Amino acid sequence: MLRTITPSEMKRVETRVMRETSITGEALMQNAAAHVARAVRRRMAGRAGLVVCLCGTGNNGGDGLAAMRILMEENPAFRGECWLLPGRLSADAQRELDRLTEAAGSPPRVAVHRIEGIFPIPEKVACAVDALFGTGLSRPLEGAARTACEALQALAEAGVPVVAVDIPSGLNGRTGQAFSPCVRADRTITFQYLKTGMALGDGLDVAGEAGVADVGFPAFPEDVF
């Protein structure tokens, strides 16, 4: 039976993985990004245009940046845009941004921008990636984050497939409450365990086709949860 856990339980498991094993945060991010990249490839099959990734400043954004680099390195014809929320990036997200910009070349095959004011939705988008927020969100989005979420909504309404990283942004990962706005994904790649909010309330609708990706956690006894 598929295990479902809360965001706080997931945090405890991640802490234990980092403390008791040789698995690094960097390795977990690369594993997660590879699963996201695979989902994007499948969603954009037969579709021409850019892949647009909207990224938060935390590790969810880092997963998105790493996935875009993987897609670019796999396909010389790949073109994309990454749009970052304002603010300082986490150390892992900054590392992935540096790797992406170094690999992108000049002119860059994946352009990187900051979201300021109105988000200019590009034309001919083949697939969009929601890497704004992870499972810890507990209140409605505001400011640039709200603008970014509304842009993803507009792309979805225009028929662009949206892949969400770990959980759709705007969805409470514990209760399944969808705040307004909330990304409606075609496909959600969540990591290691299904989050309770994806199996409750609005989560059953907005997460789309949910896939649980193994990012390399060892098996733990029940008392870790």
Positions of the model-derived regions?
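Nucleotide and nucleotide-moiety/phosphate-recognizing core
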Residues: 37-134, 140-165
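Small-residue (G/A/S/T)-rich helix-start motifs and N-terminal tracts that mark the onset
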Residues: 1-73, 77-85, 185-188, 193-225
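Short, solvent-exposed coil/turn linker segments
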Residues: 24, 114-117, 172, 218
